[in-house]
Amino acid sequence: MSDYNRQFLFETKPAQGFTPAKKPTLRQRLANRINLLTGTAVLIVGASLGAAIGAGVGIGVYNYWTRPAPVIVNNAESVSWVTAAAAKASPSVATISVSSASGGGNGSGVFLTEDGYMLTNTHVVTLDGATSSVKIEVKTYDGHIYPATVVGTDPTNDLAVIKVSSPIKFTPVEFADSSALNVGDATVAIGAPLGLSNTVTKGIVSALNRTIQVASAAAPDNSSGGGLQFYSGSGDSINLRVIQTDAAINPGNSGGALLNQQGLLIGINVAIANAGGTAGSIGVGFAIPSNVAKRIAEEIMATGSASHGLLGAMVSDSANSDAAASFSVGAKVVKLTSGGAAEKAGVLEGDIVTKFNGVAITSASELTAAVRQEKAGAKATLELIRAGKTLTLSVVLGDAGNQ
């Protein structure tokens, strides 16, 4: 018996809740093929899979709608860690369908509580920032469908909490400590790419503390450009500090789970890199760290919204020399807000911030993302360079409010 068999108590025969694989009949294979060719086409819009919401937002057409496929174990003696992790976490991951008068889309989400609170992305429940008036349905891993409503959204970190209405109890996802991750750690992604519920892919942690910039889900999305985005837009943008993984992530994975080898949540999938056009996964995906996601989810469940730190300083990228102007080495303080957190901590204009809470800062975007992931009133440390000397300052972050 394998170690994973012992850990998750797989039986020699398919365990209860698992469906043995059956070879489809010729009639079934033909019917499936016809369905794929003639089914209703759905237009992908960014991270969520959906119909066109506004002019120019279409990226590609797909129609791979199928029934959910539970984790199938045909040979319990040879299960891998991927099978074990997927079997543990799959009941906690669901497919989310969102529709409005002007369009619709699909994403993923993870259950937070037994009574139906679920975490996903803001851009999933707002159809990439197009509307707040939506109808939401959630399809669980075993194919049951329930209505849901939005509890609160956090466009700053692209997270949202919804509440599923059901008399049954759900299986909450178990959180891991994302601050304990190492580059090279194994990862598993579960979600509904292209509408294919319960899809499992694997990879590794490719990088930590990566900062990406994406269109804000609180702003209308009227562009179809490429870049480091699941969704794009011509309006406001946000900076996100994320986990980078090479596990295959595609449109529809948004809001789904990124797991460790034990099937514990390490991140909420939010974006992929693409070169524009209709490209899917190229092995560069991003997830919001579980520690950040948990903090924001708890605040939204308690108050309907989440708080964010504010440094009270305008910053810009800082190069170490004119010859190396293409590479930023920190965040230079250009202007201080009178009475703000930075000024109170002793920061001066011209200082170059190189670390925030011990993590290297090489650009203004990285500092912005790091600060906004903290809650209002959080204590933090800044390492900065002033007149060639390195200083460490303690700061109590302000409240970003609606900024």
Segments predicted by a language model, with ranges:
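Catalytic histidine site
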Residues: G46-G58, S99-A130, S178, V359
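Interdomain regulatory linker/hinge segments that flank or connect interaction modules
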Residues: A55-V73, V214-A217, I268-S318
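N-terminal activation segment of mature serine protease catalytic domains
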Residues: A55-S108, T122, L159, N182, ...
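PDZ/PDZ-like groove recognition
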Residues: G105, N239, I243-Q244, A248, ...
